[in-house]
Amino acid sequence: MSFEQKPKVTVILANLGTPDEATVPAVRRFLKQFLSDPRVIEIPKFIWWIILNLFVLPFRPKRVAHAYASVWSTDSPMREIVFEQTQRVQAYLERENKQFDLTVLPAMTYGNPGIDAVLEKLSAHPQEHVILLPLFPQYSATSTAPLYDAFAKWIPTQRNLPGLTIIKDYYQHPMFIQALAESVLAYQEQHGKPEKLLMSFHGIPQPYADKGDPYADRCRITAKLVAEALHLKDVEWAISFQSRFGKQEWVKPYTDQLLQDWAKQGVKSVQVLSPAFSADCLETLEELAIQNAELFQQAGGGSYAYIPALNSDQAHIDLLAGLVQANLDALTHTLAHR
């Protein structure tokens, strides 16, 4: 590379993933890839192979495909949002970084565009530096770590390796907390303030937390900081964890049980925020917004509303781009002094 050429830098925005279509075969392929990852399911491989192939994949894809169809438009909501986030972060960073030949790419851990395929593309175009931003605000071995694994698999295949930065998470970043709080206030300005604000996060099995996964603790910190930013009293909000899978104990309290308890206690209005999600997806649009609303109301509760994820809100784009920009500033300094 000549000295006149701008250093190539690629930024990867990576989310969990989504099926290619809202069909049973596509959902089955996606679930097989996702649920075959030992980071996600920590059960002895042979035992889990039997459970997955004989009891999960023959039955679960039909129900999940039906759920996807209820939220699908021209594409998966998550993929559409991640693509828009990528375009807007690229535009932001290009304005601020004329010194780099800079590209921002979307990637998914499972499904398309897959992280392995994205890394393979980089092999054909040597990079000065790669910055990975997992779109998981709270690190977990079940979500963020598989992206580390993808890089660990790719690195030994490369001769001219780039510099590499992985932004582990941002669960208590001031811009993140402010963006969440502002999204709640904006929603409540239009729809009113509820009796209870529930911050519901995707759950993980309790044994994972017992073994050192920091996810649940980081979720609790995020929730506490958002509540403080909103000046909420302890009785006005709570934290919970959704999407239990299997018979294992998961981190508590469980979202579905808490909503039923509130309904029985006479709570008449609830709004739900899910700060673990950077983009709305099946879990937020179908489970949180629809299933849990029915659960709460059937148990005797009244008004229930889901507050959308940050998605492509300007405050969210500013946060994501700002996280990357801090690393680009450090890279600029490094390149100027080497």
UniProtKB/Swiss-Prot annotation:
Fe cation binds at residues 202, 283. Gene3D superfamilies: 3.40.50.1400. It is found in: Cytoplasm. InterPro entries: Ferrochelatase (IPR001015), Ferrochelatase_AS (IPR019772), Ferrochelatase_C (IPR033644), Ferrochelatase_N (IPR033659). GO terms for molecular function: ferrochelatase activity; metal ion binding. PROSITE patterns: FERROCHELATASE. Pathway: Porphyrin-containing compound metabolism; protoheme biosynthesis; protoheme from protoporphyrin-IX: step 1/1. GO terms for biological process: heme biosynthetic process. GO terms for cellular component: cytoplasm. The keyword Kinase does not apply. It comes from the Bacteria. Its EC number is 4.98.1.1. Keywords: Cytoplasm, Heme biosynthesis, Iron, Lyase, Metal-binding, Porphyrin biosynthesis. It catalyses: heme b + 2 H(+) = protoporphyrin IX + Fe(2+). The keyword Plastid does not apply. Belongs to the ferrochelatase family. Catalyzes the ferrous insertion into protoporphyrin IX. This is Ferrochelatase. It comes from Acinetobacter baumannii (strain ATCC 17978 / DSM 105126 / CIP 53.77 / LMG 1025 / NCDC KC755 / 5377).
